[in-house]
C-alpha cells in the first residue's frame, strides 16, 4: 500500500457521543441541546413529551457547544426558520435551519470561526454577533463572511469566569464581566476611541467571595442575578444597565445550594439556579425557595432553559441526561397536608392508630375502642363502632385494593381479631385466635378472588384467615385456614405478606429481617414427605406455651424456603410481587429483588434507596411500569423514584414510628399519619408519579472508568428499530436485521451500567444499572458469554457473567441475560442476578481474628481485572476460571470463581511489584503437541511488566503457587517467568495478540505517552523422561522490541492490537491513533481527535465485514467510533 | 471512613503533614529539583500561585545559599506569612498584579520563576484546560519580564488535548523544554510540569504586559491537530527509585519502622469561598424549599393551591452530604 493510502485508512468516524449537556435553549416549542460538537433539536409537545427531530452534526469541530443564540426575528416568526449562532470554547458557527411542519432541514452553515480567546457570551446585534472573550475584551464579528469588525479590550485586563452581554445594537452594547478576582466589571465597548484603545470599566461591583460562574439580566425589572463558587446566588437591582453610572444594589443573597452554583436564569416571576449539588432551585425574586428539583446524578447540572409560556424548566446534567420540570410556584396544585380535625367533645378518647382504605377513606381507632371513618367526599367523621375490648391495645389495618375492599381489621392484646366491613360495620365478625397479644396484622390479596388476613400471635404463630363476602354484600365470612410458624427469634412476628402469583405461595417478611415462603393452601400438601413439615410445639422450643399441655400439638407450618435476616435486625417492612419477581424492603435502607425458583427464594439484586433513607417502608409499581420507593428520611416521609432519582413527595410527618398509612390510586396518592393527637392527611391528586420528567435518560454521573463489550444480540426483522436519531439519513434496506452491541461500563459514581448500542441507529440505551458497589467501580471482566438456553437449546439473546471491582477493595459478581422484548424502546429486556461479592477488608478482619495478624487495611483499590481461563471453549471443566486483580497496595491477587461465580474466593497473591499495579491481562498460548498454557501479565507504576504462568495453578500438587504460612491465608505466587522494563513510568494500557508464527505481540502504553511493542516467544523445555513428575516451566523471551517515545502527549489509556499489522491507541490527549506494525518500529498512520476528555479505557471489537470495527472510548463521557476494515 | 483514610490512600499527603509542609506539592518541587538542580545558584525566585505555600517554604529554605535570597510569592488566596517571603495577593492574569510583581525585580532579574497554578476545577474539561493554560501563559508573560537570560521557568501543565500548543509556545522562549512528572504526582492525574531551561527570547522580542499571551491555535497547522507533527516534548520522571509511589496505598505502619501517629493538617485553608455557606449549612440555616404545610382540609379543597407559611430557617438536619472542611 502506498504512503498516501496508508495515511487515510483506516479512518475512524464518530457514531455516538454521550457528554455533559452544556447548552440548552428553548425556541418556540423546540429545544436545542448541545452535546459535544453536535446540536440536537427536540420537539416539545404540550404534554411535555420530547421527541428528537434531528442531530445537526459536527457544528463545532473539536470544540464542545456551550451555548446557542437564536437571531431575533423582527417579525417574530421563528416557527419556520431560525438562524442560530452556536458557540463553545473558541469556536463560533452560524447555522440556518428550517423546521416548519416538524421536518427539519439545515439550509446553510457558515464556516467554523476560530476566535483568539475563549467565548463567554455571544449576542446578536443586527445581523452581526458580539462576543465576550476570555481576557475581558469584546469583539464584533460578521458571522456570515467571517471577519472581525471591532475588537475592544478593557483596561482591566484579566481572565474572566463568565460574562453577560446586554443590548441590541453596538452603540448600546453593555458587558458585565465576572473577573477571577470575584468582581463584576460593567463597561461599554462602543465608548472606545476609533483606535480601539482599552475602555475603562464604568462600574465595579463586589460581593461574592468566589468566582462568578453565571449571570442573567432581566431587562423588564432591571434585575441582575449572579451565581458563584461561594455557593450563593445574588440578586442585584441594577435598573437599565445600558445607562452608565447607575446604582447597583444587592437586594438578595440566597444560600440554598450545598455546592458551587453553575447556572442562574432570571424569569419574569422566578429565579432559577442550578449547580454542583445536582439541584435546580426555583426562587422568588425576593429570595425564597419555592421549588427544588432533584434528580440529576453526579457532578451537577450544567445547563438550564425555560419555556415561560408552558412554565417548564429544562435542565441538562453532567450525566448527559435532560429533564423537564413544571414551574408551579408554591407547590403542586391539589397537593397539601391537612388536619382532619378529629378532636371533638363528641369523640372521646385519644387516637391510637390510623389507616387508609383507598385514597378517599381514612380509618382511625381511639384508646376507648372507637373506630371512626373519615370520607373525603363527605368531609366528616363518622363512628363505625365502639368496642371497649380494643381500648388498651389495638392494631388497625385496612385491606388492600383501590377501595380497600371495603374491609378493615382490628386486633387487641388478648388474641382477639375483628374484621369490619366498612359500609356495614354491624356485620363485623370477631375471632378469638390466641391466648395472648396479637403482634401484627397484614393482608394478602390475590386478584379479586382470594383475600387473606394474617395475624401473628405469641410464640411466632401466624393465623391465616380466609375472608369472603356473601353475595348480598351484607355479611362476611371469616374462616381460619391454617397456622404458620415463624423461625425462632426474640421479636417473633411477621410484618408483611403477599401472594406469589399464581397464588400457591405466600411471601412474608418478619421482624427479624427474614423473608419467608409459605404454601398458601397447605391442605394441598397432603402427601407425606412433600412440602413443609408440620412443626410441633415440642419441636419448636420457643413456641408458645399457650396450649398449656406438654403433648405434641401442631402449632403451625414452617416456611418452605427462607432468606434469614436478609434485611438485618431492624426487620422487613414490605413484600411485593411484580413482573415475576418478589421485592422486599427493610429498615436497613435497602430493597431486594428476589425470585422464586423451584419453590425456593433466591436473591437477585440488592438496591439502595437515596442517601439518608434508611427506613424503606414499601414499594409501589406505577402504571407506567416504573417503581417508587416509600420510606422515612429522618423526620420525613419520602416517596422516591429510583428511575428519576427524584424525591417525588416529602411529608414532614415526624418519622415512621407513629401510626401511618399510605395509599396510591390513579386519582390520588394519600399519606395519613397521627400528629399532635390528630389525623393528618397529605394528598396529591393524580397519583404519586409526576409525568414526563425525564426527557432523556442520563448515563453515569461521574467519570466512566472502564468499558467492556459483552457481545451482540441479533434481532429479527420483526423487531425493526425505528431510527429516531437520523430519520432523514435512513436508506431503504439499512434497517437490516438489527445488530445490537451490549456494552458494560463502570463508573466513579459506584454503578455498573449495561448499555445497548444498536448498529443502525447511533443511539444508546441504558438497560440496567447495578448499584451494589459502595465505592467507585474501576474494572470489569466478562466470561462465559453464551445464549439463553445454552448451546443445546439456544434462544436469541445473550448471557454472560461479569465481575466488577473498584475502590475499598470490593468485588462483585453477577450474571446478565438479555433477551429480545418488543415492548421496550431498546427492543431488549435485561435481567441481572447478583451472584457473590468479596471485600478484602472483611476478609482481613476475619483473618486477623483467626491468626492474630496485624495487617491493617490500607484502603486498597482494585485497578484492573483479567479473567484467566485455560479452556474457555470448554466451560465447566475444572474448578472454574480465575480472575486476576491489579491492586493499589502493590499486590496482584488471584480469585477463584466457583459455581459460575456464586462463590468468589481469594486464592493467591504476590507483592512482586511493590508498587501500585495498574493493569493485568491474560492470554493463552497454544503450540502443536503441547498443553495449552495460560499466561498472566501484570504491569505497575514503575513501567515494568511481569509474566506469570498459571497453567497448572489449579492442578493438584502444582508448585505454581506456594502454600501459605497459615491455612486460610492466600497462596503465594512465587516469581514471574519474565519481567520486562517497558516504560519509565506507569503502564496504563496493555494488550496482546498471537502472531501467525506462534509468538505473541505484546503492546503497552504509558503515562509518559510512549508505546512499547515486542514479540514474546514461549518455549517449553524438552520433556525429560526421567522426571516426568516435575513441573515444566515455560521459558519466555523477548524477540524484537520497539519503543515509540512521544506517541501521545499524555497517558496512553487504551491500546489494542487489531492484527499483526495494525494497532490502535487512545490517550488523554484525545487522539485515537492507528499504527502500522510488522516492519520494525510501529509507524504512525493517522489520528483522529475525539471529544471525550480524560479517557480511562477503550474497547474495540469487530462487528461484521460490512460494518467494520467499533470502538468505545470511556472517560468523562462515552464516545463510539467505527471504521471499515 | 475515618480521618486516617486519606493518610492511607495518599502517602505524600501524610508525609507532608509529618514533615510540616503546608501541602503535599512540596515533594513535587523537591523531586523536580533532584532531577534538574533547579535551585543551583538561584538567588531570586518568583512563586506564582503559591497558596497555601509549600513551594514557598521549599524555596525560602533552598534559595540564596548562604546569603539570604529573595522569594516573591503570589496567589489569589490569602496565605499565612512565611519568613523571608514577600507576599502579594492577586490574580496573576491581571495586569495590575503582574506590574506589582515586576516592580520587585526591576534592575535585578530573577533566576527562577515557578508556577504551580491550577484553577478551581469545574469538571468541564475544556474550561479547566483553558483556564489552566491561561495561568501558564500569564506566568510565562511575567517570566519574560523578570527572568534573566538563561533563567529557568517551571510551570504546572495539564496534559490534555491542546498541550502540544503550549509546548510549541514555550519552545520559542527557552532553549530546552521538557515535560516532567515527579513521582509524588499521581499516575491518575493529568498534571505534569513544563521545565523550561535557558531563557532565550527570540531576537527583537519586546515583552508586553498589556496584551495577554494567547494560546496558539491549530488553524495554521492541520498537522498539529491530526497529524504526526505535533510538538511532543521529551518526558522525564523525577524522584529517585526509592521514592514512595503516590498511587500505591500504604498501610499506616510504613516499612521504615516508624510508628504511625495521626498528624493534623499543617495549614488549614484561610477563608475559603465556601466558608459562609458551610457555616449556614452547619447551623441548618440554608434556605429550604417550600413544603406543603398544614392547613385545614376545606381550604385545600377551596383553594387551587394550599396555603403555606414559608420558613427561611429550617430545622437542624443531619449534615452528611457535603464535607465542610472548615
Ligand atoms: C495547587 S495550588 C498551589 C500549591 C502551592 N504550590 C503549594 O505548594 O502550596 C494552586 C493555586 O493556584 C492559585 N490560583 C489559581 N488561579 C490563580 C490566579 N488567577 N492568580 C493567582 N493564583 C491563582 C489558587 O488560589 C491555588 O492556591
Curated annotation (Swiss-Prot), chain A:
List the Gene Ontology MF annotations in alphabetical order: enzyme regulator activity; insulin receptor substrate binding; tRNA binding
Q: Which gene encodes it?
A: Wdr6
Q: Which organism is it from?
A: Rattus norvegicus
**What upregulates it?**
Down-regulated by caloric restriction. Up-regulated by insulin and IGF1.
Which terms in the GO cellular component ontology are assigned? COP9 signalosome; cytoplasm; protein-containing complex
Q: How is this protein named in the record?
A: tRNA (34-2'-O)-methyltransferase regulator WDR6
Q: Write down the SUPFAM superfamilies for this protein, in alphabetical order.
A: Quinoprotein alcohol dehydrogenase-like (SSF50998), WD40 repeat-like (SSF50978)
Q: Give start and end residues of every WD repeat.
A: 89-130, 155-197, 207-246, 256-294, 295-335, 346-384, 433-475, 489-528, 567-605, 611-650, 652-692, 725-765, 767-798, 860-905, 912-958, 982-1024, 1047-1085
Q: What is its main location?
A: cytoplasm
